[in-house]
Amino acid sequence: MAARDPSTASNYDAWKTKHTTANLRIDFDDKCLRGSVVLELESRTAKESKEIVLDSSYVSVESIKLNDVQTKWEIKERNGPMGSPLHISVPEGADSGEVVRLEMAVKTTPQCTALQWLTPAQTSNKKAPFMFSQAQACHARSLFPCQDTPDVKSTYSFNITSPHVVVASGVANDGDKAEADGGDKVYKYEQNVPIPSYLFALASGDIAMAPIGPRSSVATGPDEVKECQWELEEDMGKFMDAAERLVFPYKWGEYNVLVLPPSFPYGGMENPIYTFATPTIISGDRQNTDVIAHELSHSWSGNLVTSCSWEHYWLNEGWTMYLERRIIAAVRGPAYFDFSALLGWKHLEDAIEEFGADHKFTQLCINHKGIDPDDAFSTVPYEKGFHMVYYLDRLVGRKNFDKFIPYYFTKWANKSLDSYEFKDTFLEFFDKPEYADLKDKIAGIDWEGRFYTPGLPPKPEFDTSLVDVCYALADKWKKGDYTPSSKDVDGWTGNQKLVFLGSVQDFEQPLSAEQAKQLGNAYDLIETKNVELKTAYYLIALRAQDSTAYQGVADLLGQVGRMKFVRPLFRALNKVDRPLALTTFEKNKDFYHPICRAMAEKDLGLSDDAKKE
């Protein structure tokens, strides 16, 4: 197969990684990973390819052996975020299907974009340092040279030495835990389902565990483990049962959740076996567990069946949003599918407004040539991708679509695909005689338009029963002289409050500073532990230029590192008080993950790219 991912320099059309062994020591003093990584690569040519090209970025390579013999290698000039390709000589080439063994002595550097190191002071109980990795989209190459593309999948063995507990994206071999030099332990994990490089994950620190379901545990700091267990245990088993009924049985053995320190930049990262999750889902009210339904859904869409490049990322995220909403509807009731989709529509509108309706990043399929995938990251592949899947569901009917779901995930399990292969799979399935009555409908699908038209997709009719009350309250506020009461939102879910706040954010005329204050006080949005609600409220207060809220915004920006909150808050604070925005960023920049820090710099006009624009 020809290489089709523009975000990799690797020649994966000539060589394909089959197994990866990571023998790494976590060095908290030097803030680096060091050790050896072994790649077993299968030749895909008949001795024509005389070199293996791997992705690398800011990683130190000390030596390389090919089949246990030292070989020539060279790190080429850096090409921006794509990194510096590593060229390794294979003088004799290899027969097609032959597997060669590449052993590399490696060490990460301070420029590594995949790791975050926290001092004991940055953790909750202040007892031990903490380290975690975040490899998506193209950051695995800064951990060790690899074929850093979702179009290549490999099984993994992890042998990780650390003075503190280690979790990794595999199943633990607890019986194999061994003492290493200096009292450190070697933690062994195996991942027997082939996964792409971006799902390689490690974390280490003072970590405790508690069960949250028959196949699931939560891992987090010892002081938080009880509240995390309470937050997640009610829904975990229900989510798993609903997911397995919808697709087919879970293939990964265990499903665990690692709740990370607050500087984790995403809501969740679907690392297999261990979802890495933001602590902002632990809100004390069980209102933000949808993130777990989302990350669990990735066990089928994204992790088992994977988009072949970030250009087709909607195949991961659009499908996952669809499965998440089906799971939530199965557990909480059918109206919650539409309710969540309406919330998502608002996020999609916001993202498209931020980019501009004609921007190429608002297309479903994006040309990534010369583009850093992190720059294109937004709600678009999630929500516009969801609308692509949901459109097909409505077109053929739920009963028929539910038969397609397991067919699709079975056909592409352990493989990667692009949008056209998805299209062909859909057409192939519905070409059966029993679906003859759908022939004209399916022939009318404008695939090219759906894939490449920028801006909002057509909006379907949604069941608004759960949101009508939210819009009604927003209408009262729009009149400008409304006196609020805490009873206005009695019995509302956190998401209903979010819909209401989203409507207020969209008012043509912002609230007055006084109204914004009343809103925060009456509905307990200033003291809430729910960061989703607090952020939505602060965006209203900033637009209202309520200066009494500015310091609260700055404080929150020092407590959370999730980009969903950090980026819009910095953009909004920057509009009303740039000096405070800049001092807040300066004060907290080392708290943020490198990915979040780079994005916030762009939002504040501090990065070299932003200065050029």
From Swiss-Prot:
Q: Name one GO molecular function term.
A: zinc ion binding
**Positions of the catalytic residues:** E295, Y382
Describe the reaction catalysed, as an equation: an epoxide + H2O = an ethanediol
Look up the EC number in the record and give it. 3.4.11.-, 3.3.2.10
Name the coiled-coil region(s): none
Q: Which GO terms describe its biological process?
A: peptide catabolic process; proteolysis
Q: Where in the cell is it found?
A: Cytoplasm; Nucleus
The cofactors required by this protein are: Zn(2+)
The family database entries (PROSITE patterns) matched by this protein are listed as: ZINC_PROTEASE (PS00142)
Instruction: Give the note describing cofactor binding and stoichiometry.
Output: Binds 1 zinc ion per subunit.
Ligand binding (a peptide): Q134, A135, Q136, P265, Y266, G267, G268, M269, E270
Q: Which domain of life is it from?
A: Eukaryota
Annotated Zn(2+) binding lies at: H294, H298, E317
SMART domains from the entry? Leuk-A4-hydro_C
Q: What is its main location?
A: cytoplasm
- Tell me if Hydrolase is a UniProt keyword of this record: yes
Q: Name one Pfam family in it.
A: Peptidase_M1
Function of this protein? Aminopeptidase that preferentially cleaves di- and tripeptides. Also has low epoxide hydrolase activity (in vitro). Can hydrolyze the epoxide leukotriene LTA(4) but it forms preferentially 5,6-dihydroxy-7,9,11,14-eicosatetraenoic acid rather than the cytokine leukotriene B(4) as the product compared to the homologous mammalian enzyme (in vitro).
The entry sums up its family as follows: Belongs to the peptidase M1 family.
Q: Provide the protein name.
A: Leucine aminopeptidase 2
According to its UniProt entry, this protein's organism is: Pyricularia oryzae (strain 70-15 / ATCC MYA-4617 / FGSC 8958) (Rice blast fungus)
